[in-house]
Amino acid sequence: MLDLRTVTVMRYILPLREGGSLPALAEADDDFKYVLKFRGAGHGVKMLISELLGGKITEILGLKIPELVFVNLDVDFGRTEADEEIQDLLKSSEGLNLGLHYLSGSITYDPGVVIDPLLASKIVWLDAFITNIDRTYKNTNLLMWHKELWVIDNGASFYFHHSWQNFDTAAKTPFKYVKDHVLLPKAKMLDEADQWAHEVLNDTVFREIVNLIPEDWLQWNDAEETPEEIREIYFQFMKTRLENSQIFVNEAKNARG
């Protein structure tokens, strides 16, 4: 049974000014530090949904990812914050947000480091499956921690939900952005990665994952669907994409040349 713990933020430590989403380092009531992703930032709850779904798929594929937790942000939190931009972000993020366990001492992955071809292939497969456009040489979104490769930041995935139409067509796209993937040159075992993914992913897994999405992350002003209908579209997207994985696997192979 898939599950996430829920913690409450006790202390805002500092902003992590990466991209436009202004994540932050914060301490929670379990005394651990988390990289906090805010519902009031950038693409809002859709980014959190991408992070949640992508993170759980990452876990199930057996890849290393910091623990994901739901994070409560109290209405009074951040009132003493001097930076107005950050204060506005905290105010607009009252309620349930998402956090990733902070890997203290980790370093950004250097593309020159040799890694196992199957591991590289699984990560490329993951990103092609969830349509994550943001694991490039410019921004690897990979960390080395305790001599192991960790996957972070899946918030730029499932980008079909920004237009929210023709999800069936979107689920069968070849994902041309794979050509920019930082690990593509090392991904020499894409067929094996595809086989592995089909062994561990299935409808039951997808149903459990979409059921993790909090109800209030599905109250969209720009969609006519109910929260349950939105959940169902995410489920159908993943189900269809897995059934047609050869489309994006072939695209990745062709991009490798």
Where are these regions (language model features)?
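Phosphate/dinucleotide-binding and metal-coordinating scaffold of catalytic cores
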Residues: M1-G257
